[in-house]
Amino acid sequence: MRRTWVVILCILLLALTIDFHPRTNKVTRAQTGGPTMLDPNLAIRAVIGDLVTPIAMAFIGPNDFLLLEKNTGKVQRVVNGAVHSTVLDLGVNFASERGLLGIALHPGFPTNPGVYLFWSCQGTPPPESNPFFPVEQECADTPQLGADTDNILAVPLLGNRVDRFLWNGSTLTFDHNLVKLLSFQNDGAPVPPNQGDETQPPRGNHDGGVLAFGHDGKLYIMFGDAGRRGQLQNLPSGPTLTGLGPTVPDDQFGGPQPDDAHFTGVILRLNADGTTPTDNPFFALGAAMNNEVGTNLQKVFAYGVRNSFGMAVDPLSGNLWDQENGEDAFDEINLVEPGMNSGWIQIIGPAERVPEYKLIETTALHHEDFPNLQQFRWGPERIADTPQEALSRLFVLAGSRYSDPEFSWKHVLAPAAIGFLNSRALGPQYFGDLFVGFSVPEPLGGPLFHFNLTGNRRKIGVDDPRLEDRVADNLTFHEMTESESLLIGRDFGIITDIKTGPNGNLFVISLDQGTVYEIFRSK
């Protein structure tokens, strides 16, 4: 999404009387009495507070979980509601949306002690005389530990990575790297020239970072577009007027083909050891290419993704779901199937709503000085005028399929973490429901939504007749019209993870409140 975590915290400073402590990276929120649930049978307790930018968690036992702190690079072990120990301290670049972002345990844990982490490593900042080219291509395989940085240019080209660590009962030790992905974003370089982005600031967002193991034993990795405008963003020829026509480079590193520097906006599917499953949707296609681009395509499960902070596996069906953040228009909830093309940048929201997508993006000044799609080299005026035109522009890989979202919001409401409740502990009516948190504390101080799925677990069930089209036509940004029936809680702040605990209760991480909450049945 457009807002980096830094910008989010600035908004919070104004809106919620928050003090940011640079020396510790801690965020403290003015007390409002804490979050509440609309169902009187449900209650909330704080499991642990005073955490530093908590972002993700994984249970390793009853009342025992590993918790990631985005800005410190620390993996904290929390036992019985207190930090027991720091089991790993990575030296991260936490500028913008970078940092220590995602965790997944091997499906055979703890017999198989694998713990997988998505994080952003550090690099040497480029000299002021040549700021558009990073000093290093990638970090060393062995992770750097200790001190962190928020220097937005202090990253190698491929500074986002997924590594496997081993849990020995008290600490995490590095095992091996699975994949290294783009991190460096400084698109103000006049190479290629005259794309309109010469004055664009450096960025560090759209890194995705969510990890999940599927019922198939494969590791799914969410990686955002990192601001690229190439083939995996449905610009087959790069950032030309329509994305079609003579091929042009995406940036100073080349493109638009998905080589290592442009391999973004995807959900990857890997074996637990980091190798590529031969049943991936584009495995044969990539093998026939026999080059770097082909090797990357072999790893792809889905593409055309803008960015996402939420991905989860339905415990009942095994289906993969995600949320996708729009720019100003059409946040999404998606059922992700093999070979899915989610449509970005040509389409966001349902394809039939493309005219509304274009209207919103060309007229909105949502925290911006002028309408844009964040990367200035492909502006919103280039969006197609009709659904048919948008569909005709898509980058089509053999075996891919465009898919409309299962649910969307007309104006951005900024969903973040998603998670399924895999128990009846809150009551049978909530078993298997999808819970959705948000990445800004507006409206209602940070709402918590929940969705029922249909009997076949492939669609969103709705009770409100206004939602029969599975689009909430809210009136403006961060406004809840047509979402009233989805609301189940409020005042959670920025929700970065939602998990079912070993006791069956729902656990929710609030980044800005520095707290892990537990939702339980009280009556």
Please give the residue ranges for each predicted region.
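Blade-level signature of beta-propeller repeat domains, shared across WD40, Kelch, NHL, RCC1
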Residues: 497-523
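Blade-loop segments of beta-propeller domains
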Residues: 83-105
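Surface loop/turn motifs at the tips and blade-to-blade linkers of beta-strand repeat domains
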Residues: 46-52, 88-95, 179-181, 201-202, ...
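Residue position within the beta-strands of beta-propeller blades
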Residues: 67-68, 117-118, 221, 322-323, ...
